[in-house]
């Protein structure tokens, strides 16, 4: 029912854009589990979504992020990273933006 003081949540970015994380905090977003709602934030996100100008879009996303941080809509504490070593002899293996490894395409060069 949303009646709690703090919760831990996680999200893995599936595409490389700030809106991937910021959209989660828009009023009414189905993944807005904390029920954050702020008119200034929503307006900045709407502006970012409605412009084709890259600089204007970037400024609107920065504004939305500023509002989110000022209102403590979330407290980022961690970012997932993967680290690995791979021999130059191994080819064809790739890692998707979703975090999946595709070993089935791998080969070992002699």
Regions found by a protein language model. Give the residues of each.
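Short, solvent-exposed loop/beta-turn-alpha elements that line the ligand-binding surface or hinge
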Residues: 1-2, 20-50, 79-110
């Amino acid at each position: 029912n949303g009646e709690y003081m703090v919760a831990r949540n996680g999200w893995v970015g599936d595409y490389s854009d700030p809106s991937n994380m910021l959209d989660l905090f828009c009023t009414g977003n189905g993944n807005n589990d904390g029920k954050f709602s702020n008119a200034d934030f929503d307006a900045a996100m709407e502006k970012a979504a409605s412009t084709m100008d890259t600089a204007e879009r970037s400024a609107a996303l920065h504004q939305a992020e500023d509002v989110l941080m000022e209102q403590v809509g979330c407290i980022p504490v961690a970012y997932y990273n993967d680290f690995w070593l791979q021999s130059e002899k191994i080819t064809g293996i790739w890692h998707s933006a979703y975090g999946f490894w595709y070993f089935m395409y791998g080969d070992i060069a002699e």
